[in-house]
């Protein structure tokens, strides 16, 4: 009679494998359930984007037509690329395009530097009550409308009764006609934009900073590292993903601008159009003159250029993120 040998090692290994399979099955079911939950959570947002962004995009066909309101979109004659030719031949186009890109570049740099600086200061603060107070102060301007912000700017820079001119007059100086001085408005608009948006940017960066271990910064302090060294060597490398995310969002709109902001802050003063006219304000006036095909061509060009810019930054971000991971690990 053949003896059956009992190998405890084989039994133990088989048990481990069975447990691993069971655990893997549980994890897979959990992942599937989580994916379904995330899908239904994001579904309303996806529907809103499709309804309000993708479906209306079909009206860009106007850019290729000689659109007449009385004849409608379908009844209007095809114009091919004529509207785009007129756009590029417009004598103001290059100047306005440059204004738009420069403004958005300045917005991106100033807002991100201010937001990252504020978030880092909050992260380094120890007192929770002070953190909460300053976060509220930073975010509050974001909820102020540009109409009200425009009134604040007008109260400061009004040619006749502005606070700044009153202070200048008090010290014996001559009043400055701010709304007839184009050179100062890029600075005013950039500072106003930063005041309104840097707080929200700081919230995003502050959330990213929460993933950093305080032990690392404390160890660096014990080794004698200064604040700048801690920021550049510990904090910044770990929030690069958030920096790139904000960069992609901002770069995608580099050829667009906030129409309400420019009109409310400048009050559409003709004397400063040279430095405050951007694509949105210029071509919105084209819509007011019923030249809708021309304005649609400008809008389509803005969207296409923004998509290309965002794609370029996304590729750059992916490459830099992979390089950073290789350097760390």
Regions found by a protein language model. Name each.
Residues 2, 6-32:
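Short, Lys/Arg-rich, polar N-terminal cytosolic tail immediately upstream
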């Amino acid at each position: 009679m053949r003896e059956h040998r009992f190998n405890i090692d084989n039994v133990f290994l088989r048990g481990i494998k069975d447990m691993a399979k069971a655990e893997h099955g549980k994890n897979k079911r959990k992942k599937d359930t989580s994916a379904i939950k995330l899908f239904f959570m994001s579904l309303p947002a996806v529907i809103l984007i499709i309804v309000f962004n993708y479906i209306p995009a079909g009206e860009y066909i106007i850019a290729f037509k000689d659109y007449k309101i009385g004849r409608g979109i379908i009844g209007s004659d095809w114009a091919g690329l004529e509207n785009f030719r007129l756009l590029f031949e417009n004598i103001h186009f290059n100047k306005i395009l440059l204004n738009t890109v420069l403004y958005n570049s300045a917005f991106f740099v100033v807002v991100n530097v201010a937001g990252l600086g504020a978030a880092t200061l909050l992260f380094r603060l120890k007192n929770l009550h002070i953190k909460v107070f300053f976060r509220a102060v930073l975010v509050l301007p974001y909820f102020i409308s540009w109409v009200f912000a425009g009134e604040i700017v007008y109260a400061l820079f009004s040619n006749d009764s502005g606070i700044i001119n009153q202070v200048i007059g008090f010290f014996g100086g001559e009043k400055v006609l701010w709304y007839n001085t184009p050179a100062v408005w890029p600075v005013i608009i950039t500072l106003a934009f930063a005041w309104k948006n840097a707080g929200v940017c700081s919230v995003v960066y502050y959330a990213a900073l929460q993933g950093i271990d305080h032990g690392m910064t404390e160890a660096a302090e014990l080794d004698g590292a200064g604040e700048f060294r801690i920021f550049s060597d510990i904090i910044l490398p770990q929030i690069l993903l958030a920096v790139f995310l904000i960069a992609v969002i901002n770069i995608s709109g580099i050829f667009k601008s906030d129409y309400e902001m420019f009109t409310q802050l400048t009050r559409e003063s003709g004397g400063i159009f040279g430095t405050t006219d951007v694509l949105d304000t210029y071509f919105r006036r084209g819509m007011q003159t019923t030249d809708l095909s021309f304005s649609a061509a400008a809008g389509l060009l803005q969207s296409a250029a923004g998509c290309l810019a965002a794609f370029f930054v996304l590729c750059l971000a992916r490459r830099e993120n992979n390089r950073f991971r290789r350097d760390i690990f």
